[in-house]
Regions:
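Glycine-/small-residue-enriched transmembrane alpha-helix faces in small-molecule transporters
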Residues: 1-55, 100, 147-151, 161-194, ...
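Transmembrane alpha-helices of multi-pass small-molecule transport proteins
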Residues: 2-9, 22, 47-96, 122-127, ...
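Loop-to-transmembrane-helix transition segments
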Residues: 22-30, 76-101, 173-181, 231-250, ...
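Helix-helix packing/entry segments at the starts of transmembrane helices
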Residues: 29-32, 56, 113-119, 192-213, ...
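Specific transmembrane alpha-helical segments of multi-pass solute transporters/efflux pumps
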Residues: 36-37, 73-117, 151, 244-262
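Membrane-interface helix termini and inter-helical loops of multi-pass transporters
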Residues: 39-50, 106, 155-170, 223-240, ...
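Structural signature of hydrophobic alpha-helical transmembrane segments
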Residues: 49-63, 103-120, 171-184, 234-246, ...
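Hydrophobic transmembrane alpha-helices of multi-pass small-molecule transport proteins
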Residues: 65, 136-160, 272-273, 279-281, ...
Length: 331
């Protein structure tokens, strides 16, 4: 063994420690930032039209991703021409998952929305993949436990809404939108995951092409408030730009870095902490008046973590691990 090889082996432990440290820092930043952004939308952006909010936020993110693709000389046009079917499917599912997510955050607490959204994804992927992979007791037990707590969480929030009759309709809409958003995100994982592996799509190719339909639809629906966003004296346009960074751009970068350094299995156990962190932020900003719903939010987080731990020890990747590998974002 020559001197260079010996030096490389000596440096290996430090490199591993450094990579692990970076990975843990990035996944921690991802969870904190995603939770903060969700609470921010729920608390501060309820008066702006949901379509306008979605369009302006994703437009900033889209421009950022296109700039990165240009600098890296990614051939986006060729990717679109070669994968028309994949592009159409991913755009339709992205429209529902992202637009409904923003609408849900305007109608229900961020912790509840995040728990419903993240909790329904593993079950959707499990059902969709049942024919190809089968459903064993080990694969089904975790999602079944999550479904139980999701049902109890929805029922608890319904009951609380009943005590606040003026908000009942809004809360019901928020819960329904969060569940639909999470379910379509799960469908996105199932429909596009194999195609991305087969065709070797890069992260930037996916990110620069999946939001096009969403931008067209929300741009059309929310165009009447664009002037309000630009002329707002409270700096609404700047707030939306910062929101785009905190809810889309930076989380994607942090998540991908953590997956690269820690592996998808470890990361998939950390991401369900987002609703719990959102819950903690809500207690600081606007404390809950009762304890049942917050406890159920935490139980949903715990059940998803348990589900992912069980599935990550099986021979095949679990649904949320698959989501992290293929989608590049829990959103």
């Amino acid at each position: 063994m020559d001197e260079n090889q010996t030096h490389a082996l000596d440096e290996l432990p430090n490199a591993i420690v450094s990579a692990n440290t970076l990975g843990w820092l990035c996944i921690t930043a991802y969870c904190l930032l995603t939770a903060f952004a969700a609470v921010w939308v729920s608390e501060s952006f309820t008066r702006i039209d949901g379509a306008t909010l979605t369009f302006t936020t994703l437009l900033v993110a889209q421009l950022f991703f296109l700039s990165c693709a240009f600098l890296k000389k990614e051939n986006i046009l060729l990717f679109v021409l070669d994968n028309k079917s994949l592009i159409v499917k991913s755009n339709v599912l992205t429209l529902f998952s992202w637009y409904f997510m923003f609408l849900a955050l305007q109608k229900v607490e961020a912790s509840v929305e995040s728990a419903l959204y993240q909790g329904i994804i593993p079950m959707t992927v499990l059902v969709c993949s049942a024919r190809a992979q089968g459903i064993t007791l080990k694969r089904a037990l975790g999602p079944a436990l999550t479904l139980l707590f999701l049902t109890l969480l929805a029922e608890s929030r319904f009951s609380l809404a009943g005590m606040e009759s003026s908000h009942t309709s809004t809360i019901i809409q928020g819960i329904a939108l969060a569940l639909i958003a999470g379910a379509t995100a799960g469908l996105y994982v199932h429909v596009t995951g194999a195609a991305h592996r087969q065709w070797g799509a890069t992260l930037l190719q996916v990110l620069t092409t999946r939001f096009v339909l969403l931008l067209v639809v929300t741009g059309f629906l929310g165009h009447e408030q664009f002037a309000l966003v630009v002329s707002n004296e409270n700096g609404l346009a700047w707030k939306l730009m910062f929101l785009a960074l905190s809810i889309v751009v930076l989380p994607v970068l942090f998540l991908q870095t953590s997956i690269k350094n820690l592996g998808a299995s470890r990361v998939s156990v950390m991401t369900p902490l987002v609703p719990a962190l959102a819950l903690a932020a809500e207690f600081v900003i606007n404390p809950w008046g009762h304890i049942t719903t917050p406890i159920l939010v935490l139980m949903v987080c715990l059940s998803v973590i348990i589900s992912n731990v069980w599935l990550n020890h099986s021979d095949r990747p679990g649904p949320v691990e698959t989501q992290l590998r293929e989608e590049g974002s829990s959103r």
